[in-house]
């Protein structure tokens, strides 16, 4: 029950944030950079906790895995609006803007993989979770390889 409340709260909060954020433009490019980096930091934290389970460094706990997958899935749509024209910088490579179609396709692929990961995590099927985690992590890696400064 706590997990359902957390997911409901997180989803409602995200919808409110995305609706407001989509309407508002960032005042300064630095604001967009900070916003997207903050979203990615929270996602990376939750992803890292799941990764520890997949690697056998932490015990499998269905509720914890489901919670972290829900966090990542809820946040996955948010950072992309902060990569608009004039927001170059941070850890993003120029290819984000020069090859924006490829970047957009990579972001959509990641969001689909994260949705699958969330579905698998919520099901409680450990093997399905691990398989989906691997697929989702590959989409993250692919985007990092192509679009994030080393």
Task: Say what each PLM segment does.
Residues 1-10:
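Bacterial N-terminal signal peptides that target proteins for export
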Residues 136-148:
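The canonical Cys-X-X-Cys-His
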Residues 26-133:
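Extracytoplasmic c-type cytochrome modules immediately beyond a signal peptide or single-pass transmembrane anchor
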Residues 16-21:
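N-terminal signal peptide c-region/cleavage motif recognized by signal peptidases
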Residues 124, 147-150:
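Inter-heme linker and motif-flanking segments adjacent to c-type heme-binding CXXCH motifs
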């Amino acid at each position: 029950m706590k997990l359902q409340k957390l997911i409901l709260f997180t989803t409602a909060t995200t919808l409110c944030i995305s609706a407001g954020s989509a309407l508002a433009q960032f005042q300064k490019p630095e604001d967009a950079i900070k916003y997207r980096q903050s979203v990615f930091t929270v996602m990376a934290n939750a992803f890292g906790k799941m990764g520890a389970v997949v690697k056998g460094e932490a015990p499998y706990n269905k509720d914890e895995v489901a919670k972290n997958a829900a966090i990542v899935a809820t946040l996955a749509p948010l950072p992309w609006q902060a990569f608009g024209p004039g927001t170059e910088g941070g850890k993003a490579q120029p290819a984000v803007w020069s090859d924006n179609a490829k970047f957009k396709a990579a972001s959509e692929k990641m969001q689909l993989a994260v949705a699958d990961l969330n579905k698998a995590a919520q099901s409680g099927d450990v093997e399905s979770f691990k398989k989906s985690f691997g697929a989702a992590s590959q989409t993250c890696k692919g985007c990092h390889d192509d679009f994030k400064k080393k």
